[in-house]
């Protein structure tokens, strides 16, 4: 659909060259859906907002109209396939913007800024300085808000209101509109500059066919219904709507045109300098006034913006008026019980309660306002050198906040209140306006503003006498000159405890503390021959301590419910033979499912409705459960200390069971018929279930047949609440995290996708196995797992392919492949992890099991709040050993395996299963 424009004059690329995988546009990964926004364009060389993502190659893999937002470029060999990482809000070059011309030098440098300086320096553009001088000459040392309201903005506002009043039902005939050019592009559509009755207007055309079960018409009507109610000088005015002529009959919204573009554009363009204190205060006040209007002016209840970002704040040509724009995601809170849990907005500005899909109120806008204040003071983007999804996790889980070192105390106090982790403790916008009035009379603010005014006047006169801007530039202090020393002194002290945080959270010490510029080289571990040495082991092999040997195979084995007796004292075998009549020899084991909380596991069988319960405490079968149909796949969850099992049946039903202790008190020889709590009938003709996962809130099913993922709410609905189309690509495996909205899928084309199930959106794609002519096409990803299903701080995901036998370890924050292992020779049937032991295994039908250890202890990470960077980008996985168990199984194929405790593995072959201690 569109590509990023390259910035030929981009400065500071040295710092970002190695950080190509970071996506830092206004929405980035997660899409956490952003509506279209009127983002004004730059002149040549000023596309700063997209510089951070312009090096990423976008590959068009998703055919679903709801999710596809990036165009296809020439595919390169890379572990990262960021086809869905492109932000919905993109900046389109507008060469006719008279203010941003070549005199600006393509934007300020990309160096680091010294925000601790007591004398903020002005931005350098002579045109901007001249406009500020005019304002200073009228308002003295501070911007006079009454002048702003009574000036050009008020006149233009009244003119538009008068024109608007002549319309009937907001309808504007398309013949009255002259579309001049495209100036922006967003998630819901495109924005154009147009002329209407002699006035410049912005025309927003809705092009998205469907979004979250809303049709194009419903999307259009929703935004119009909100915008048509608004009439305030600090909200972009809705003028009318029209249907454009043409076969598509597209509907468009006509809005007020703001010549100055977005606040984000201004801050990106002048990122090496400070805005004047008075301008900071003026912009903050305008935003607060507009938001106070939205939250308090309507009898029906507040209008929650839900996407308040610097890209959605538009400025007039002199930057003296800021207006709130883009109400595509806004929601009216009607009287009566109101519940909002859908994640909306852009990651850096998203309140923690919104990201975690908790109930939230209008206070999410106050949190977003705090982030905008931080941007205004620093002229920096709020991702702070971090990958967006990682930033969102840190803010919501660890109470991470952006650095406030060097900020004036009045801003520190206000920002800290606005982004408080507890929404009820955040001030209202009415209270914020009172605080802003107090700041205007603060002695420190007056002093800073006076110094800034003096510097500006001096630089202006110098510029006039010299006929160039070089003299005024010499009076300015670039942020990069002093911030380097600050960063060097803080390199070993990156995190600062926040004593005011109710969760013992922390602030970043410096703007660049969390740079993800380091690339981790993928290493490959390949072995060629695995000898069978279970029964043929000798003491020499057991005593081999050569650390360079890749293959280590000494272990103790136990045979559970097996007809085979092993008597080999050299291998320290502990025989335990149970009654083999407990198993039906005609049943072939399909899968083992370890229930760590009960120290037991469930055994399912191929083409059978029998599930057997095995207790590890007494190492015996205790019960046989009989289902209504044969089991396809199953997953369990612990909810309120109760064990629940969700099972996909061969008749395509989804059944929910509670596994009570009484269910396991019977005999293994007499099956107990287990009645489901709830049964959901799935459409077998279309969505034939191949895999199932359960995050404790939603059951998620995947189908290879219709290439889709369906989300089910077991409590509220008998029908899927959402469907995610995978664009015709078969889905082989899925996994999710407990009580988190993230899930991953492994596809038949060798791709791994990360999904946000709240928005039914694929926000990132990784390439596990690129297409290969030698392999006869794509290599599917048969196994995907989160390494820590319950620890949201762990960014590691695990992927495996049966065809190429590769086991890969990824950091989902940075989309970096940390490790790649050639773990088997024949095939790779699955991956299993044990969070308590921090170990994982892969297994192959050839009779080999590969054991791996985590590089760091995730449990220790979860207990450290103030002195550890959660995420641990280098938290890789280490290979331990390969175990060959062919002789134990009499050379029968290995079918399933689980690691149940430290170095203890259970596995199955035909109708038997075994235990070994590696």
From Swiss-Prot:
Annotated Gene Ontology cellular component terms: cytoplasm
Protein keywords: ATP-binding, Kinase, Nucleotide-binding, Repeat, Transferase, Tyrosine-protein kinase, WD repeat
Region annotation (Disordered) ranges: 1-122, 457-504
Binding site for ATP: 183-191, 204
Catalytic activity, as annotated: L-tyrosyl-[protein] + ATP = O-phospho-L-tyrosyl-[protein] + ADP + H(+)
WD repeat start-end pairs: 626-667, 684-722, 724-765, 776-820, 823-862
GO molecular function: ATP binding; non-membrane spanning protein tyrosine kinase activity; protein kinase activity
Enzyme class, first EC level, given as a word: transferase
Gene Ontology annotations of biological process type: signal transduction
Biased composition (Acidic residues): 56-84
Active site: 307
Residue stretches making up the Protein kinase domain: 177-445
EC number: 2.7.10.2
Family from the record: Belongs to the protein kinase superfamily. TKL Tyr protein kinase family.
PANTHER family: SERINE/THREONINE-PROTEIN KINASE TNNI3K-RELATED
Name of the protein this chain belongs to: Probable tyrosine-protein kinase DDB_G0283397
Species name: Dictyostelium discoideum
């Amino acid at each position: 659909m569109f590509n990023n424009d390259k910035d030929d004059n981009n400065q500071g690329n040295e710092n970002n060259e190695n950080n190509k995988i970071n996506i830092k546009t206004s929405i980035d990964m997660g899409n956490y859906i952003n509506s279209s926004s009127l983002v004004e364009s730059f002149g040549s060389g000023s596309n700063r907002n997209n510089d951070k993502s312009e090096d990423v190659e976008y590959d068009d893999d998703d055919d679903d109209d709801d999710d596809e937002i990036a165009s296809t470029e020439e595919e390169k060999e890379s572990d990262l396939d960021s086809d869905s990482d492109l932000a919905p809000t993109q900046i389109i070059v507008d060469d006719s913007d008279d203010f941003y011309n070549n005199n600006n030098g393509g934007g300020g440098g990309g160096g680091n800024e010294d925000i601790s300086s007591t004398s903020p320096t002005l931005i350098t553009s002579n045109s901007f300085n001249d406009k500020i001088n005019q304002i200073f000459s009228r308002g003295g040392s501070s911007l006079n808000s009454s002048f702003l309201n009574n000036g050009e903005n008020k006149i233009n506002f009244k003119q538009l209101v008068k024109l608007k009043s002549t319309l009937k039902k907001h309808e504007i005939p398309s013949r009255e509109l002259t579309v001049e050019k495209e100036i922006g592009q967003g998630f819901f559509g495109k924005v154009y500059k147009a002329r209407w009755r002699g006035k410049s207007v912005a025309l927003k055309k809705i092009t998205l066919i469907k979004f979250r079960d809303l049709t194009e018409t419903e999307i259009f009507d929703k935004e119009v219904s909100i915008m048509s109610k608004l009439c305030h000088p600090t909200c972009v005015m809705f003028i009318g709507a029209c249907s454009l002529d043409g076969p598509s009959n597209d509907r468009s919204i006509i809005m007020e045109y703001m010549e100055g573009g977005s606040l984000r554009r201004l801050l990106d363009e002048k990122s090496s300098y400070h805005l004047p204190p008075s301008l900071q205060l003026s912009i903050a006040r305008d935003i607060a006034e507009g938001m106070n209007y939205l939250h308090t002016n309507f009898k029906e209840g507040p209008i929650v913006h839900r996407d308040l970002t610097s890209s959605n704040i538009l400025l007039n040509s002199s930057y003296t008026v800021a207006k709130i724009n883009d109400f595509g995601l806004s929601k009216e809170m009607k009287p009566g019980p109101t519940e909002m849990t859908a994640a909306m907005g852009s990651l850096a500005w998203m309140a923690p309660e919104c990201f975690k899909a908790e109930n939230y109120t209008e206070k999410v806008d106050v949190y977003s306002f705090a982030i905008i204040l931080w941007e205004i003071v620093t002229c920096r983007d709020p991702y702070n050198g971090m990958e967006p999804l990682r930033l969102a996790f840190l803010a919501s889980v660890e109470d991470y906040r952006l650095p406030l070192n060097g900020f004036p105390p009045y801003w520190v106090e206000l920002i800290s209140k606005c982004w408080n982790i507890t929404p009820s403790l955040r001030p209202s916008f009415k209270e914020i306006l009172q605080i802003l009035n107090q700041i205007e009379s603060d002695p420190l603010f007056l002093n800073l503003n006076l110094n800034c005014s003096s510097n500006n006047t001096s630089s202006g006169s110098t510029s006039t006498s010299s006929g160039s801007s070089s003299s005024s530039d010499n009076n300015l202090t670039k942020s990069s000159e002093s911030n380097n020393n600050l960063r060097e002194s803080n390199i070993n002290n990156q995190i600062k405890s926040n004593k005011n945080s109710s969760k013992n959270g922390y602030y970043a010490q410096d703007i660049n503390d969390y740079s993800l510029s380091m690339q981790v080289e993928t290493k490959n571990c390949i072995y060629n021959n695995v000898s069978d040495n279970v029964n043929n082991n000798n003491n020499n092999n057991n005593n081999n301590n050569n650390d360079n040997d890749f293959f280590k195979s000494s272990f103790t084995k136990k045979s559970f419910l097996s007809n085979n007796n092993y008597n080999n004292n050299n291998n320290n075998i502990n025989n335990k033979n149970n009654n083999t009549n407990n198993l039906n020899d005609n049943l072939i084991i399909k899968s083992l499912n370890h229930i760590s909380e009960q120290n037991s596991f469930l055994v399912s069988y191929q083409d059978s409705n029998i599930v057997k319960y095995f207790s590890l405490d007494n190492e015996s079968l205790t019960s046989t459960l009989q289902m209504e149909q044969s089991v396809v796949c199953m997953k369990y969850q612990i909810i309120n200390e109760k064990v629940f099992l969700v099972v996909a049946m061969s008749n395509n039903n989804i059944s929910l069971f509670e596994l009570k202790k009484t269910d396991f008190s019977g005999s293994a020889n007499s099956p107990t018929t287990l009645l489901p709590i709830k049964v959901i009938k799935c459409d077998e003709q279309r969505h034939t279930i191949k895999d199932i996962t359960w995050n404790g809130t939603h059951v998620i099913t995947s189908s290879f047949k219709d290439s889709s993922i369906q989300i089910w709410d077991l409590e509220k609905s008998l029908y899927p609440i959402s469907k995610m189309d995978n664009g015709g690509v078969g889905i082989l495996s899925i996994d999710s995290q407990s009580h988190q909205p993230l899930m991953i899928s492994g596809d038949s084309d060798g791709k791994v996708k990360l999904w946000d199930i709240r928005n039914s959106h694929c926000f990132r794609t990784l390439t596990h196995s690129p297409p290969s002519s030698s392999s006869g096409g794509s290599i599917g990803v048969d196994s995907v797992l989160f390494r820590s299903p319950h620890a949201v701080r762990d960014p590691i995901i695990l992927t495996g392919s049966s065809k190429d036998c590769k086991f890969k370890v990824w950091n989902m924050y940075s989309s970096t492949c940390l490790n790649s292992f050639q773990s088997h020779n024949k095939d790779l049937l699955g991956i299993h992890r044990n969070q308590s032991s921090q170990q994982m295994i892969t297994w192959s039908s050839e009779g080999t099991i590969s054991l791996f250890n985590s590089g760091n202890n995730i449990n220790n990470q979860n207990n450290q709040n103030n002195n550890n960077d959660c995420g641990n980008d280098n938290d890789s996985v280490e290979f331990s050993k390969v175990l060959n168990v062919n002789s134990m199984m009499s050379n029968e194929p290995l079918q399933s395996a689980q690691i149940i405790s430290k170095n203890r593995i259970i596995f199955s072959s035909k109708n038997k299963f075994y235990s070994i201690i590696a």
